[in-house]
A protein has these predicted regions:
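Conserved catalytic/switch belt of AAA+ P-loop NTPases
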Residues: 128, 153-167
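A short hydrophobic beta-strand->loop->alpha-helix junction that borders the nucleotide-binding pocket
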Residues: 46, 102-107
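Conserved alpha-helical scaffold flanking the Walker A/P-loop in AAA+ ATPase domains
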Residues: 29-33, 88-90, 114-138, 146, ...
Length: 263
């Protein structure tokens, strides 16, 4: 998905009624940098897949592109004061803000699943223009794991000579595969796995009709990564887990049932 003026069919980035939380280290770092005038134009968000890196980057974009001050916060513990009814933040949530570009692998005609070099080149042009609403221009690449070396090299010039009032959030689950020159020009913030309770809360908010038992199983199996928990739920992998546990705790192992489960 790409979000920018003129891009077709933008999709909502996140639901402000169910905002991400639990990563105050990142949100506090962004706030401190902006308020202290020490803004790193490139931010590299690392951590396990599904832990919420993209969601936190989108939330930071909503905060950066807000148009009024003094609103109530999405989540009290994050310190990021934004209101989903703020004009700028609302456009970010809906995926329509002209000063936000989100780059993800294209779905059509993209067997490799990679972010294409042309997408990175469009990013260069996007950040080179003045903000449409007079504030910042923000871009999110989700994720750098799908950017090849040519794309990373094209991105490097942006990181070396960033235009004024631009922020670039790079998402990476495998940052060690990135060129050292890219990593060295970014402020690196690790987004760790959530604790069990925070993970359960996020999964429960996303699946309000599910039982508490299933929510607990999904949170435990995901190891603190809510995105992974939702993927497990979609594939019904947690059902296999519960069936296997039930078989293995029987006084006598039902080898036939176990063999059927493994098929």
């Amino acid at each position: 998905m790409k979000v920018a003026a003129g891009i077709e069919d933008p999709q909502p980035l996140f639901d402000p009624s169910r905002p991400p939380f639990g990563h105050a280290l990142f949100t506090d770092a962004v706030i401190s940098a902006i308020e202290g005038g020490r803004v790193a134009h490139g931010w590299l968000l690392t951590g396990p897949q599904g832990v919420g890196k993209s969601a936190m980057a989108c939330m930071a974009a909503a905060w950066m592109l807000r148009e009024t001050e003094g609103q109530t916060s999405f989540v009290e513990t994050t310190g990021m004061v934004v209101d989903p009814d703020d004009p700028g933040s609302n456009l970010v949530c809906k995926g329509h803000h002209p000063d936000l570009l989100v780059i993800r692998p294209e779905i059509k005609d993209n067997k490799s699943g990679q972010i294409k070099l042309d997408q990175i080149r469009k990013l260069v042009g996007f950040l080179g223009h003045k903000p449409g609403r007079g504030g910042w221009r923000v871009a999110i690449i989700d994720s750098m794991d799908q950017v090849n070396r040519n794309g990373a090299n094209a991105l490097l010039k942006l990181l070396e000579e960033p235009p004024e009032h631009t922020l670039l959030f790079l998402i990476a689950s495998r940052p060690g595969r990135l060129p050292p020159t890219v990593r060295s020009r970014c402020r690196v913030v690790r987004i760790p796995a959530l604790d069990g309770e925070n993970c359960k809360t996020i999964v429960a908010n996303a699946m309000p009709e599910e039982s508490e038992g299933r929510i607990s199983d999904l949170a435990r199996l995901s190891e603190g990564a809510p995105g992974r928990a939702l993927s497990l739920a979609a594939s019904q992998s947690d059902d296999l887990y519960r069936t296997a546990c039930a078989l293995l705790t029987e006084p006598r192992l039902d080898e036939g049932a176990l063999a059927a489960l493994c098929e």
